[in-house]
Amino acid sequence: RVAGIVNLVLRNGHVVHYEATGKRGSENEMAMEVDVLFRIYSMTKPVTSVAAMQLYEQGKFQLSDPVTKFVPELKDLKVLNEDGQFEPVKQVMTMHQLLMHTAGMSYGFNAQNDLVDQLYLRADLSSAANLDEFVVRLAKLPLRSQPGERYHYSVAVDVTGLIVERISGQRLDEYIKEHILEPLEMNDTFFEVPEDKRDRFTQNHFINPETGTLVNSDYAPAPYGYRKGVALSDFFDVTLFAGGAGLVFTAMDYARFAEMLRRGGELDGVRILGPKTIKFMTRNHLAEDSMH
């Protein structure tokens, strides 16, 4: 079912198991190594959220702030309700809702059965040249629910990445590198894989549901929710820094990030976030009846 795996287990901050097994891809006979670079997709989201919360700690925004304070492009959004009718937004979309995936946005993963997701898929957000163009396209799409009404996994963290850019005055990749990756010595984490490290970059795969075999999706048509016939993302010449899905990392690098969170925002004497902020971030912010 998989070509290769890197297993890394930490207990109380100490490595107790670290092993690579298998090969690097369905079309790559090279042995898997512990320093291989993987696309981490949605594991990018906590990194972007930490970047945003650093700015929150500095007083650069409040969780009650309207998203339109930083992204005015979203001021005229409509909601496509379950009856297929457009209705006005009833309350302001807040930064807190954006970080909780309760802002009413979507992703396009259920395009076969959902009209809003079909519109997301047609908008082809991932082909935008940069985050500014991304949000211009997003602004033309309807919300699937009223802000704050329910949880739905979405592109909200990509919008958060744009807000990090606009508040900090830095590109998202530059901000994350300076304020998170370099302080934590995460030297193998990138939005764009350096040329001298591309030999460690793994192939991307999905499982063919009809045959149960691995398919290299760098070349094959992609599953639902992505553009057909192209790689899921380009990690060699990046201009769209996707805060929700854009990073590449090694297992050890992400372990350092996770250990920083476990220790309350600090690792090896370097503080990334305050312990109260970490405690706030890791509590349950969703009511049970909103988990739809």
Which residues are covered by each model-predicted region?
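Active/ligand-binding-proximal structured segments within catalytic/core domains
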Residues: 48
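PAS-family sensory domains
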Residues: 67-68, 92
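Short clusters of small/polar residues that mark proteolytic maturation junctions
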Residues: 20-22, 66, 219
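Short, surface-exposed loop or secondary-structure junction motifs
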Residues: 77-292
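Short, conserved catalytic-motif segment at the N-terminal edge
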Residues: 1-40, 60-62, 76-82
